[in-house]
Amino acid sequence: MSPQTETKASVGFKAGVKEYKLTYYTPEYETKDTDILAAFRVTPQPGVPPEEAGAAVAAESSTGTWTTVWTDGLTSLDRYKGRCYHIEPVPGEETQFIAYVAYPLDLFEEGSVTNMFTSIVGNVFGFKALAALRLEDLRIPPAYTKTFQGPPHGIQVERDKLNKYGRPLLGCTIKPKLGLSAKNYGRAVYECLRGGLDFTKDDENVNSQPFMRWRDRFLFCAEAIYKSQAETGEIKGHYLNATAGTCEEMIKRAVFARELGVPIVMHDYLTGGFTANTSLSHYCRDNGLLLHIHRAMHAVIDRQKNHGMHFRVLAKALRLSGGDHIHAGTVVGKLEGDRESTLGFVDLLRDDYVEKDRSRGIFFTQDWVSLPGVLPVASGGIHVWHMPALTEIFGDDSVLQFGGGTLGHPWGNAPGAVANRVALEACVQARNEGRDLAVEGNEIIREACKWSPELAAACEVWKEITFNFPTIDKLDGQE
C-alpha cells in the first residue's frame, strides 16, 4: 500500500460509488432564511426511485459527482451541499415528482445570475438517470437579492420620467421587422408616435444588418422622437436595440443613444446573456436610460412542461439582472401563455412581496426587499378588440404593444396608432366608471367607434381575428 493510500484510508476515505440519497436526501432538514430554494419537476428513468432522483439533482447542481472523491474530506459537505428536503407527486402524472432543493448561499457569487444558473440549471439537466428535468420556481432570499442592483430605474421612476400616469403605456413594434431602410424605418416610428403611442420598438432581431446599420437607425429614430414630441406635447421613446456581438459594441451603442438624448434602449437578454445584460443595466442606471428587455429564445427553454425552466424563473432572474420592461406574453394574443401562470409571474415582476400560490404556479413566497419592479409588456398578435381584456388582465402598470395591430391599419400607421390610443382611453375611462371590462369590453369598443373613424376601421379589419389554440404549458391539475 502506498503512503498516499494509507493517508486517505486513515481519514475515512472509501473509494467507490454510493447512492446519492445517502448524502443528499435529507427530509429532516429545516430550510434557512438564507437558502436559495428550488422546485424541480423530476421525471426519473424507469427503476430510479424519486428520492434518488431528487438527491441526484441536489448533488449534481452543488457539490456532488458520480463517485466518492477523497477531497470531500478537505471541506465540509454539510455546510456546502445542496439538499433535497421534500418530494411530492405531481397530480395526474404517475412518473413526475416535484423535488424541493435547498442551496446554501455560499455556493453562489454575489450579484451574478450567471453563476447562480451555471450551478442550478447546469450539467444536471443532461443527467442520464433523469428522463426529464424542469426548474419550476426559485426562492431568492433577501440576503442574495441585496447583492443585485436590479432594474435600472423601476416603475415609479419611469412614470415620473415620462410624466404618464393612470393607464397602461402603449407601444408598437415596427414592421416588417427586417428589410426597411433607416429613413423609412424612422418615418414609421414618427407616424406611430405622432398618432398617440408612447413608444415604438426595434424588433428583437434588428441589430446592425447591411440594409440598416445601427447608427443610421438611431439617428433617424431620434429625429422621429423629437419631431413627434414637439407636435404632441408628450414625451416619446423608441426602444433602440443595443444588442450586439460583443459587450464592448453593445455599450458603444448605448453610449450613442445617451448622447442623442433618447430615453430608452433595448436588449435581448437571453441571446445576449446575463453577464452582458447586467453590465448594460448598470450603465443604464448610471446614465439615466430606461432598459427594455426582449425575451427572444425563451420558448426554447420554457415551453415544454416536463423539461427546461419555467418563465417565472427567467422573470425573477431578469429582475435581479436588471431591466425596466420585459415581454410577458398576452394571454389573448398569438403567443403561448396560460392566464393564471402569466398573472403569477407578472406579480413576481411588479410587486415587492408575493405570497406562495400554487393556483398561479408560485411555489415559494418571494420577498424582493424593495428591489425596483419591472413593467410587463404584452406583445404578440394583439389588436383593438383585445384592448379591454389586456387592460383588465395587466392593469395600469404594463406596456401594451401592438405591431401589426398598429401598422396593419387600412389607412396607415398614424391612424393605426390613433385607433389604439382611443381604444385604450375608452377602456380606462370605462373601468374608472366602474364598468366590467371582461363583460362589457366589446360594447365599450363599439361605443368608442362612434367618435373615432380610425378605431371603427380597425375594428372592421380585425373583427374575425383570434388565436384560439390550447396552451401547452398548463398548470398542474388543469384540463
Swiss-Prot record:
One of its GO terms (molecular function) is monooxygenase activity. GO terms for biological process: photorespiration; reductive pentose-phosphate cycle; response to abscisic acid; response to cadmium ion. Its main location: plastid. CDD domains: RuBisCO_large_I. This is Ribulose bisphosphate carboxylase large chain. The modification N6-carboxylysine is found at K201. Pfam families: RuBisCO_large, RuBisCO_large_N. The basic functional RuBisCO is composed of a large chain homodimer in a 'head-to-tail' conformation. In form I RuBisCO this homodimer is arranged in a barrel-like tetramer with the small subunits forming a tetrameric 'cap' on each end of the 'barrel'. The modification N-acetylproline is found at P3. Heterohexadecamer of 8 large chains and 8 small chains; disulfide-linked. The disulfide link is formed within the large subunit homodimers. Interacts with RBCX1 and RBCX1. An intermediate complex made of eight RbcL subunits interacts with the chaperone BSD2. It is an enzyme of class 4 (lyase). The modification Phosphoserine is found at S208. It catalyses: 2 (2R)-3-phosphoglycerate + 2 H(+) = D-ribulose 1,5-bisphosphate + CO2 + H2O; D-ribulose 1,5-bisphosphate + O2 = 2-phosphoglycolate + (2R)-3-phosphoglycerate + 2 H(+). The record marks K334 as: Transition state stabilizer. HAMAP family: RuBisCO_L_type1. Binds 1 Mg(2+) ion per subunit. It comes from the Eukaryota. GO terms for cellular component: apoplast; chloroplast; chloroplast envelope; chloroplast stroma; chloroplast thylakoid membrane; cytosolic ribosome; plant-type cell wall; plastid. Its cofactor is Mg(2+). Residues 1-2 form a propeptide.
